[in-house]
Amino acid sequence: MYDGLKGFREFYPGEMSARREVTDTIETRARRYGFREVGTPALERTQLYVDKSGEEIVEELYAFEDKGGREVSLTPELTPTVARMVVAKQQALAKPVKWFSTRPFWRYEQVQQGRFREFYQTNIDIFGSERPEADAEVLATAADALTDLGLDGADFEFRVSHRDILGGLLAAMDSDVDTTDAIRAVDKREKIDDEEYRSLLVGAGLTHEEADTFDSLLRTDDLSELVEFAGTDRVEAAVENLQAVLDAAADFGVREFCSVSLETARGLDYYTGVVFECFDTSGEVSRSVFGGGRYDDLIESFGGQPTPAVGVGIGHETLSLLCQRAGVWPAEELSTDYYVLTVGDTRDVALDVARELRALGHVVETDLSDRGFGDQLSYADGINAETVVVVGEQDLEDDAVTLKDMASGDQTQVPLAAFPPEEGRPTYDDYA
């Protein structure tokens, strides 16, 4: 007996049906905003993540040497890949470039609530617009996808911040601070205790007093206090940009889902401007549901022309927890429109009926095991068939078939020449 690997899951048809419905809902919303689907590889050169993603991602890579002697890794995230793709065809692409994709990723990390070693994300990115409206459109696409799933403002919030505010405040300190390490500490704030958090800030170069000041500034509700403390154009511009994005979010109708939270940092090194994370407002799903933000320098770092960019990666594992908590996760059940049941030597006619129903777009099953009437009916119940079409020898003598409603058990005979009709999904109720 072979057991599955820890952190890698199988999805049986009922659960997979629910996951497919969620994925389709998100992707439909992305398409309505004009995002185009792309396909990306499962393997990349390991050096791509060493150079672009940061230490935390590199430590979690599924990395190995392939048979050609190349150091490669299973993709742990999408952003570096799509950035590389943009650079490869930058001159030919109409700007802004708006892409999305849904696919699995892999990270060797501790398995816990909403976190697995193989996980699925829908990534939504805009390349080529520095306007705050681009940030707002990404927020709006994500928010609308969540409301399409049945969630509302009582279920989730977007905590919005700005990396240049964090970097500008750190630069205003007297000490020589490692900004990258300090921002990583902020990103871990909700996952560690206060003592460890402050230890990380001090380890990044802040004095204990500066760490207290920095932490206090991140908690302020008055953004003008940040501008006054730093006294720099950098922080002033970042505050203005953050406000502009929030104003644009209001224009898109999603400002109600957004709150300013400077303790939101995002751990990946390539983020540059506005960043955000989605959280369960009840706190039951304790970790970030998903996040995103600006990465304006990444395309240029690949050798491309300077190209502003912003995106979000919607993690399906934590999203499923949020939907389940809110009671909007789709039913995990099989769904079949028709089961065509044969009695006696009627298989040819039954297959003709099934073929016509499928041509109309319906989900149809027939007997593949030469079972009797009772066993076929039990199978139809097991696959949650809505309607059973009985094609029996007696029915055919009457030039008819029998429709049986599986919920009520009621049935009626229907002329074969009139079934199925050219449109609709006929059931017992249409003929009773």
Swiss-Prot record:
Superkingdom: Archaea
Enzyme class: ligase
Broad class of the protein's primary localization: cytoplasm
Keywords, ordered alphabetically: Aminoacyl-tRNA synthetase, ATP-binding, Cytoplasm, Ligase, Nucleotide-binding, Protein biosynthesis
InterPro entries: aa-tRNA-synth_II, aa-tRNA-synth_II/BPL/LPL, Anticodon-bd, Anticodon-bd_dom_sf, His-tRNA-ligase, HisRS-like_core, HisRS/HisZ, HisRS_anticodon
Region named Disordered: 412-432
Pfam families per UniProt: HGTP_anticodon, tRNA-synt_His
Reactions the enzyme catalyzes: tRNA(His) + L-histidine + ATP = L-histidyl-tRNA(His) + AMP + diphosphate + H(+)
EC number: 6.1.1.21
GO terms, molecular function: ATP binding; histidine-tRNA ligase activity
GO cellular component, one term: cytoplasm
Gene Ontology terms: biological process: histidyl-tRNA aminoacylation
Composition bias type Basic and acidic residues, residue spans: 422-432
Compartments where located: Cytoplasm
Cross-referenced Gene3D superfamilies: Anticodon-binding domain (3.40.50.800), Bira Bifunctional Protein, Domain 2 (3.30.930.10)
NCBIfam families per the UniProt record, alphabetical: hisS
Stated family: Belongs to the class-II aminoacyl-tRNA synthetase family.
HAMAP family with a match to the protein in the record: His_tRNA_synth
Protein name, entry field: Histidine--tRNA ligase
Annotated source species: Natronomonas pharaonis (strain ATCC 35678 / DSM 2160 / CIP 103997 / JCM 8858 / NBRC 14720 / NCIMB 2260 / Gabara) (Halobacterium pharaonis)
Lineage: Archaea, Methanobacteriati, Methanobacteriota, Stenosarchaea group, Halobacteria
